[in-house]
Design a protein with these regions (language model features):
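Active-site rim/loop-helix segments in enzyme catalytic domains that contact anionic ligands
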Residues: 1-122, 154
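Metal-dependent de-N-acetylase/amidase catalytic core
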Residues: 2-13, 30-31, 91-206
Length: 206
């Protein structure tokens, strides 16, 4: 093995197309697998079509796009102190933002996602995923973290998460700080690759 230890048998698991370049840009070329979860956003056909075009143009062959349907629960948790659940955070009906709000699908898809990831993460030594507070507080990010974290002991990989937080996620981050280990060393970003991927998302308006 050459390079940092985090690159050894590394998988990246992120919720949406573009999250990989935002939260794991320094590890994209080193990863053996880049797993992106969501595809269609009901009620947003242009975004859905744009994502399909972006994924078709993605420059790395390690991409594995699951194309699960988004559940429209963004910003529906009781921030800044959401109720945590096995499957993520509780999406409150009174706080719905999108017409596609589907908390039942959000609950169901957790188990489907775990099953899909169990196969894909088998044999991995390191996994980069979203943090338990979802960076800026995205309910989809938190669900992806929960699914990945629930498999870490079973499959024997080490889980790494971004340290970024927004003001609204400070409380949730504080709840989880005691579970975090030592940080990874700062790693350089492949600026040319990041710019290439970012341009794809700009061109497809995703």
């Amino acid at each position: 093995m050459t390079g940092p230890a985090i690159f050894d048998r590394l998988a990246i698991v992120m919720a949406h197309p573009d999250d990989e370049v935002l939260w794991a840009g320094s590890a994209l070329r080193a990863a053996g697998k880049i797993i992106l979860v969501y595809g269609e956003l009901p009620g947003a056909p242009e975004l859905t079509a744009g994502r399909k075009a972006a994924m078709a143009a993605f420059p790395l062959q390690t991409l594995d796009w699951l194309e699960m349907v988004e559940t429209g629960v963004f910003d529906s948790a009781s921030w800044p102190s959401p109720r945590e659940t096995e499957y993520g955070v509780y999406p409150h009906p009174a706080l719905r933002v999108f017409d596609s709000f589907d908390p039942d699908r959000y609950r169901r898809q957790f188990h489907q996602l775990r099953d899909l990831l169990r196969v894909r993460l088998s044999g991995m030594r390191n996994v980069i995923a979203h943090g338990p507070w979802g960076e800026y507080g995205h309910e989809d990010h938190i669900q992806v973290f929960r699914a990945v974290a629930s498999l870490a002991d079973e499959l024997g990989f080490r889980l790494w998460v971004p340290g970024y937080r927004a003001p609204k996620t400070a409380v949730l981050m504080q709840r989880h700080l005691r579970f975090l280990g030592r940080p990874c060393e700062a790693l350089p970003i492949d600026h040319a690759l990041a710019a290439q991927i970012a341009q794809i998302y700009k061109d497809t308006r995703t």
